[in-house]
Amino acid sequence: EGLGKVLRYGAYDDEVLARLRWMEKTLAPALSRALAAHGPLDLRSLIAQALQMGDEVHNRNRAATSLLIRALAPHLVRTGADADETAAVLRFLDGNDHFFLNLSMAASKCSLDPAAGIPGSSMIAVMARNGTDFGIQVAALPGRWFTAPAPMVDGLYLPGFTAADAAPDIGDSVITETAG
């Protein structure tokens, strides 16, 4: 979805819904075709390169997103429904520096899951926030949550909003911080 006026930040209007519908009807099928043509993506390699380029693949994903576009662009062009649609998909990806975040989150979770159940391990294997609680799971104790109240975030707000409008910390992307 990107940054700014998006559903995950609490925005919900016709513009947000139109973008989500476009993502469902146009972006997802285009990416599906391109991925089928490309074959499996080596996310570990993309992340390693992005880290060397200054990303930390949570709040900064510019390099990782650019590397992803570089990998998929030829396949988007080759499998695209038409030139205008392909151009719109590439513009969306290019204008969304956070596009890689979802892939980073999945890669982080997959890399951490094998740690679950290692006897005696004090490694933090999961961190999560749901707007009410902040929780962790320790590798030696899979499935057992240690929780505390989710803190309020001192962050930036969309125009017209203040800290009084905010909810406590929420989101699954903290799994990237768990992975380091």
Q: Where would I find each of the regions flagged by the language model?
A:
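Small-residue-rich
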Residues: E1-A63
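Accessory "access/gating" subregions that flank catalytic or transport cores
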Residues: V57-P168
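Conserved phosphate/anionic-ligand binding catalytic regions in large, soluble enzymes, centered on
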Residues: D169-A179
